[in-house]
UniProtKB/Swiss-Prot annotation:
It catalyses: ATP + H2O = ADP + phosphate + H(+). Belongs to the RuvB family. ATP binds at I23, R24, G65, K68, T69, T70, E131, D132, F133, R174, Y184, R221. Homohexamer. Forms an RuvA(8)-RuvB(12)-Holliday junction (HJ) complex. HJ DNA is sandwiched between 2 RuvA tetramers; dsDNA enters through RuvA and exits via RuvB. An RuvB hexamer assembles on each DNA strand where it exits the tetramer. Each RuvB hexamer is contacted by two RuvA subunits (via domain III) on 2 adjacent RuvB subunits; this complex drives branch migration. In the full resolvosome a probable DNA-RuvA(4)-RuvB(12)-RuvC(2) complex forms which resolves the HJ. This is Holliday junction branch migration complex subunit RuvB. DNA binds at R294, R313, R318. GO terms for biological process: DNA recombination; DNA repair. It is an enzyme of class 3 (hydrolase). Mg(2+) binds at T69.
């Protein structure tokens, strides 16, 4: 199974990127949720504009689908400058990065998505560019090779990553502003869904928006994807308007339950409960039992289930929590009740 095959995958798809551009907010006052990040960035941007300086280099990290690319574009819009976008895997050689840097205008934003995937040789070129606005490049080969320095206009590097821990210390230390994006509340997601529906011209009531929001796993990208699929259902099997009942029927048909779990999530939890007595069980045993790759479970399925408190990682292996039993209407084993082996851990 590939992450992007799932309806509730947080990672984006090429076609969605095009569709999402139409509904992305362009200014900070249109940006919903993340109140601390929004307030801080408004302050930093206003200060930089007041001094007629480029904004400090900014690192944005957090789970996929929370709006890192959107925020990078908003920063450029608020600063009144252009944004040049690329990603870590695309910048294979120092020359690739040099070409982008030398085409920047003063105060422009260079956005690098998946910045944790930059190659070491490209990263070395980035250090003096970030710190001194200079580009060190080698001319010639062998004994005749020499280094020359090119001055760059002051610019803002905005880096986005889902894995901040994989950044090297020298790179991380060169960012003056570091922002973490958190999962969204159902209330904020409902506001996002309502806004998107308005832009797309979809009739929808507040309860319909909330029904979509509560199944979107705290992620705007998933919420907008579910909205498009519910729209299809409403147009074909309903009267076009998205109500709570229509959203509920559509999402049940799409196999997304009220917690945002799909078939793969439920299969993982039920396998642990039915075949391994709730655990502890090793990752390799789970992978063999459900026919998935180890890394798929670890990187795709587990994170949200752990974040929601349905699975625990213990020194002896994975264990489901009492929330998993309650979700399926099953009796809770004694070890998850008060005084049981996993009761204290389950409450943490």
């Amino acid at each position: 199974m590939i992450e992007t095959d799932r309806l509730i995958a947080a990672s984006g798809r090429d076609r969605e990127e095009v569709q999402d551009r139409a509904i992305r907010p362009l200014r900070l006052d249109e940006y919903i949720g993340q109140p601390v990040v929004r307030e801080q960035m408004a302050l930093f941007i206003q200060a930089a504009r007041g001094r007629n300086e480029s904004l400090d280099h900014t690192l944005i990290f957090g789970p996929p689908g929370l709006g890192k690319t959107t925020l990078a574009n908003i920063i450029a819009q608020e600063m009144g400058v252009s944004v040049k976008s690329t990603s870590g895997p695309i910048l294979e050689r120092p020359g690739d990065l040099a070409a982008m840097l030398t085409n920047l205008e003063p105060h422009d934003v260079l956005f690098i998505d998946e910045i944790h995937r930059l190659s070491p040789v490209v990263e070395e070129v980035l250090y003096p560019a970030m710190e001194d606005f200079q580009l060190d490049i080698m001319i010639g080969e062998g004994p005749a090779a020499r280094s020359i320095k090119l001055d760059l206009p002051p610019f803002t590097l905005v880096g986005a990553t889902t894995r901040a821990g994989m950044l090297t210390n020298p790179l991380r230390d060169r960012f003056g502003i570091v922002q973490r994006l958190e999962f969204y509340s159902n209330k904020d997601l409902a506001t996002i869904v309502s806004r998107s529906a308005g832009i797309l011209g979809l009739p929808m009531d507040d309860k319909g928006a909330f029904e979509i929001a509560r199944r979107a796993r705290g992620t705007p990208r998933i919420a907008n994807r579910l909205l498009r699929r519910v729209r299809d259902f409403a147009e074909v099997r309903g009267k076009g308007e998205i109500t709570k009942a229509v959203a509920d029927m559509a999402l049940n048909l799409l196999d997304v339950d009220e917690r945002g779990f799909d078939h793969s999530d439920r299969r993982l939890l039920l396998t642990m409960i039915e075949k391994f007595d709730g655990g502890p069980v090793g990752l390799d045993n789970i992978a063999a039992a459900i026919g998935e790759e180890r890394h798929t479970i670890e990187d795709v399925l587990e994170p949200y289930l752990i974040q929601q408190g349905y699975i625990m990682r213990t020194p002896r292996g994975r264990v489901v929590t009492r929330h998993a039993y309650l979700h399926f209407g099953l009796n809770i084993p004694g070890r998850f009740c008060e005084g049981g082996e996993y009761a204290a851990q389950d409450d943490e």
